[in-house]
From Swiss-Prot:
Entry-linked InterPro entries: Ribosomal_bL34, Ribosomal_bL34_CS
Gene name in the database record: rpmH
Protein name, as recorded: Large ribosomal subunit protein bL34
Keywords, comma-separated and alphabetical: Ribonucleoprotein, Ribosomal protein
Protein family according to the UniProt entry: Belongs to the bacterial ribosomal protein bL34 family.
Gene3D superfamilies in the cross-refs: 1.10.287.3980
Listed PROSITE patterns: RIBOSOMAL_L34 (PS00784)
HAMAP family, per the entry: Ribosomal_bL34
GO CC annotations on file: ribonucleoprotein complex; ribosome
Length: 44
């Protein structure tokens, strides 16, 4: 059986990257929430 996690830097950036988050309203809310929590890393 093939494992579920097949790492790829491009896919990671496209799905969870900063630009992907900024593209949607929900994503912007995610970033805002992470900022208020004081997260060191906001996105992948």
């Amino acid at each position: 059986m093939k494992r579920t996690y097949q790492p790829s830097k491009i896919v990671r950036k496209r799905r969870h990257g900063f630009r992907a988050r900024m593209a949607t309203t929900g994503g912007r809310k995610v970033l805002a929430a992470r900022r208020t929590r004081g997260r060191k890393r906001l996105s992948a």
